[in-house]
Amino acid sequence: MRTSQYLLSTLKETPSDAVVISHQLMLRAGMIRKLASGLYTWLPLGLRALRKAEAIVREEMDKAGALEVLMPAIQPAELWQESGRWEQYGPELLRIRDRHAREFCVGPTHEEVITDLARNELNSYKQLPINFYQIQTKFRDEIRPRFGLMRGREFLMKDAYSFHLTQESLQETYDRMHQAYCNIFSRLGLEFRPVQADTGSIGGTGSHEFHVLAASGEDDIAFSDSSDYAANIEKAEAIPREKARAAASEELRLVDTPDARTIDELVRQFGLPVEKTIKTLVVQGAEEGRLVALIVRGDHELNEIKAANLEQVASPLAFASEAEIRAAIGAGPGSLGPLNLPIPAIVDRSVTLLSDFAAGANLDGKHYFGLNWERDLPLPQVADLRNVVEGDPSPDGQGSLVIKRGIEVGHIFQLGTKYSEAMNCKVLGENGKPVTLIMGCYGIGVSRVVAAAIEQNYDERGILWPQALAPFQIALVPMKYESAAVREATDRLYAELVAAGYEVLLDDRDKKTSPGVKFADMELIGIPHRIVVSERGLAEGTLEYKGRRETEVQAIPAADLITFLGNRIGR
């Protein structure tokens, strides 16, 4: 491809509304253009990268035995009402009416549509297991679209759905999809982690997210430094570092703390180690009108997902108001603790290993110092309540946890019978009786993968594409293309490279575009390999080569270039 026949729309300045690096670089490199909030047009350069990601996803899905279909983007309300999600999904679901006043939605996901397809097309156990997938544009009416393609309203997604007679069959397909996803992200050249995850609004039982590691990620993920263990921070089990509780060495005393309403104030004013303090959070109980206290160490954070999953706690999690707390306990937030607490309490594991700790006295402006379990008060119910922190023991017993930011690019679920039961999706089993199908679903944000790759691969000059995603493999830049000798050599080399199967962008812009601008554009776009043709090089029988990730320029004998590139690019 020649730039004279291409849309090369690079920008020198970064648009003011672009916050994350992928958004900035995709706009500056001329890959996308904003149409409206959360809506983007893919320009030719960006579309090449997107199609490469899509092709790898399709190849691995086909290899894993999934069957490609294409479902409508517009879905009838009746299907969503049948599953119960029409009311549950919320304002992210864009609802529309046709001219006959029939209700539809623009699909953010396709569980209902595929379940309807399955119940109409599948009738016998002999057709199972089966796994359908599509690569299609989705729409979610995000309240605050931001970060370009990272959180847009319209996006390209690969979603797959499998149907099974047994949990064992589902597990086999789930494992196959897990491996297919690992293959996809490995082929894309990304540093990623599959992590145990909460199932969220999709529902179901088992769940894994796939995260590309990047500082701009919205999720915290925890993984072992010595094994394959990894989990979303919402899901990661918090194992205390301490093995046993130290013996008590202080007397219990009641201390006036009128100006210490927070852990930070208590620690600062009294010189306490923060790990020797606890905080008591009061939430609504599962039983109406009942409050429950959740107690974690002062330097730890309550994990709201874990808390909401407790049998005694209302879900979704709801914190009690100050008025409710005062009515039940007689003191306000900031002065609460486990001693003489008149409501049920659940403490985190780490709290049970404390000795000589400080806690609110359930009297405004007062705390107990030197508290000790079993001497001063019995241990209440114990549960895993907190977020893990870096350095915690890995739950699999191997090494310590590292916490990094991640961008979620894939998610797989074991749905169970949530949708098939609601929508009466059954087949005849071996005994001739109807059997409700067990489902799995498997999603990849294809357009988000492209943005995530940039978040992980860039420098001060532009994008550093992984080889598999680069829009072009080679940038061919002639110096003085108006020179007959340079033009002839460049055109001949371009033809040879294309004939050898390489994707080449020939920068044939005229002399009004300086070599420096050409080099800067090719680096901004992120083409992995650059070849320069010059009069001096031709006189010496050499071509100038520079890898995008390298600082040094090499002089390559012109006769050896194809072999050289074959070794570098892997042909």
Curated annotation (Swiss-Prot):
Catalysed conversion reaction: tRNA(Pro) + L-proline + ATP = L-prolyl-tRNA(Pro) + AMP + diphosphate
One Gene Ontology molecular-function label: aminoacyl-tRNA deacylase activity
GO biological process terms, semicolon-separated: prolyl-tRNA aminoacylation
Cellular component terms per the entry's GO annotation: cytosol
A Pfam family this chain is assigned to: HGTP_anticodon
Broad class of enzyme this protein falls into: ligase
Domain of life: Bacteria
Keyword flag Amino-acid biosynthesis: no
InterPro entries named in the record: aa-tRNA-synt_IIb, aa-tRNA-synth_II, aa-tRNA-synth_II/BPL/LPL, Anticodon-bd, Anticodon-bd_dom_sf, Pro-tRNA-ligase_IIa, Pro-tRNA-synth_IIa_bac-type, Pro-tRNA-Synthase_IIa_type1
Keyword Ligase: yes
EC number: 6.1.1.15
Signal sequence annotation: none
Domains: entry comment: Consists of three domains: the N-terminal catalytic domain, the editing domain and the C-terminal anticodon-binding domain.
Functional note: Catalyzes the attachment of proline to tRNA(Pro) in a two-step reaction: proline is first activated by ATP to form Pro-AMP and then transferred to the acceptor end of tRNA(Pro). As ProRS can inadvertently accommodate and process non-cognate amino acids such as alanine and cysteine, to avoid such errors it has two additional distinct editing activities against alanine. One activity is designated as 'pretransfer' editing and involves the tRNA(Pro)-independent hydrolysis of activated Ala-AMP.
PANTHER family with a match to the protein in the record: MITOCHONDRIAL RIBOSOME PROTEIN L39/PROLYL-TRNA LIGASE FAMILY MEMBER, PROLINE--TRNA LIGASE
The protein's name: Proline--tRNA ligase
Lineage: Bacteria, Pseudomonadati, Pseudomonadota, Gammaproteobacteria, Pseudomonadales
